[in-house]
Amino acid sequence: MLRILLINSDKPEPIQFFQKDKETNDSINISVITRSCYAPLYSHWADHVYIVDDVTDLTVMKSLMLEILKVGPFDHIVSTTEKSILTGGFLRSYFGIAGPGFETALYMTNKLAMKTKLKMEGIPVADFLCVSQVEDIPAAGEKLGWPIIVKPALGSGALNTFIIHSLDHYEDLYSTSGGLGELKKNNSLMIAEKCIEMEEFHCDTLYADGEILFVSISKYTVPLLKGMAKIQGSFILSQNDPVYAEILELQKSVAQAFRITDGPGHLEIYRTHSGELIVGEIAMRIGGGGISRMIEKKFNISLWESSLNISVYRDPNLTVNPIEGTVGYFSLPCRNGTIKEFTPIEEWEKLAGILEVELLYQEGDVVDEKQSSSFDLARLYFCLENENEVQHLLALVKQTYYLHLTEDHMMNQ
């Protein structure tokens, strides 16, 4: 009997994968650790469901694991969400279970540890400082030079991430209710780094046994933070693009520094005006937003299926069959409130090059979400003859896009 522990929230891809696995394979025992609000997603198919208030609480998770192991040992621990990755690494290392360990997970989730290690290894990163309270931000700005980026050391999706342009800007944010999001009330580690002018790329990989099984390198239409709450996206670069080989070498250097051997990686890279490539961040997960579906449309593979197969040491079932052309996606931003109307889907579908329109909300939906890099109304997937056509299509999308609300809920704006 193969025993698997899944640590997850409501992330649908692992749920669908392991539920199907359970239904078709009698020799698998699947236990799940999740929050109580997500338990109904698992209770009808998982063998055991364990409830915790916070999967990031390592003390609680270790104690729970000791109880669970009385039933029998686990062969694999699967942790696919940003909040569960560090916990998964800790539990594997502490209990001697195969898979990515605590140190690798720490470097790929804690941005302060990440950038400190990269700097020690001689891999270029923007100048940064540790910040333990928001009142220390002015000193960080003076030392690094304004503008700076301030964000939690642990987190994803650009949640509670701020570009602060000057001391006056900081004081305005500090004195405004909600101006610094949850940074003021959270007693958690932060990182401040120099905000630089650049182009931004992302490199998405799958590793198994220390080898790269798959790589896709893409360019964002606008740097992520500057594109927040605006139409943005990315497109996959040709392997013949001069920057492709440079980014791939940088990816390999990071993987060696962090001892990445198995699973997915999502690396963000900056190219400065001088042409220097520096590492932004790397995550031990599949890229968010429309990235995985974009890659599926280009290469005819499922990053999720292959990644989850790797997590339980199976054949990744990875046969790459790329289509011709430049494939990418645009994210159309959503806003909090009750959705009255938005651009008819037919207006987007008739644009030349559009492959699919993915709607995340419908008219009449009441939306109350935190602002993040994946807070989207819709995503448009496209295939064009070459990347020179991307900006033209983006301009057409901007002309057609509108979103009208009947009321705004400001708490999470």
From Swiss-Prot:
User: Enzyme class, one word?
Assistant: ligase
Q: Which reaction does it catalyse?
A: an L-alpha-amino acid + L-arginine + ATP = L-arginyl-L-alpha-amino acid + ADP + phosphate + H(+)
**What are the binding positions for ATP in this chain?**
141-202
Task: Cite the Pfam families for this sequence.
Answer: ATP-grasp_4 (PF13535)
**Which E.C. number(s) belong to this protein?**
6.3.2.48
Q: Which UniProt keywords apply?
A: ATP-binding, Cobalt, Ligase, Magnesium, Manganese, Metal-binding, Nucleotide-binding
User: Main role?
Assistant: Catalyzes the synthesis of Arg-Xaa dipeptides in an ATP-dependent manner. Has strict specificity toward arginine as the N-terminal substrate.
Chain sites annotated for binding Mg(2+): E268, E281
Show the taxonomic lineage.
Bacteria, Bacillati, Bacillota, Bacilli, Bacillales
Spell out the molecular function terms from Gene Ontology.
Answer: ATP binding; ligase activity; metal ion binding
The reply on keyword Magnesium is: yes
Question: What are the boundaries of the signal sequence?
Answer: none
The answer on whether this UniProt entry bears the keyword Nucleotide-binding reads yes
Descriptive protein name: L-arginine-specific L-amino acid ligase
Q: Which residues form the ATP-grasp domain?
A: 115-312
**Species in which this protein is naturally found:** Bacillus subtilis
Self-association or partners: how does it assemble?
Homodimer.
Q: Describe how the cofactor binds.
A: Activity is maximal in the presence of Mg(2+). The use of Mn(2+) or Co(2+) decreases ligase activity.
List of residues binding Mn(2+)? E268, E281
Influence of temperature on activity: Optimum temperature is 37 degrees Celsius.
Cofactor section: Mg(2+); Mn(2+); Co(2+)
How does its activity hinge on pH? Optimum pH is 9.5.
